[in-house]
């Protein structure tokens, strides 16, 4: 967990130094800060697997990078855009992938370990529904703020 916190705070501090826009940075990074608080509060009672903590860290880093540059202007993806002659910077697609995949993995782990839904087909259906609802909620918040 020390490496988790070290990487988390290193990227958080880096992302807060001269971002493209501080208000946008705050909006993009606040979910990562909330996630850290939730993880800290639940760590002793319900430890997640190393895989899940790693995926959460990767998702937080994606949010922090997007907050620092804005999703449309991440330099590596500008380079990729130019090399492959694309019309736009596709970093937001990485963010959307993480927004769907990481919550699905978290929900799956919690549901399996707590034995909430025993039938695999229903469990998988619920996880997909949860992630769709969570992502839709997140998009509504983004729309409301914009």
What are these regions (language model features)?
Residues 1-12, 57:
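Alpha-helical transmembrane segments
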Residues 35-42, 98-115, 146:
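Membrane-interfacial alpha-helical segments at the cytosolic side of multi-pass membrane proteins
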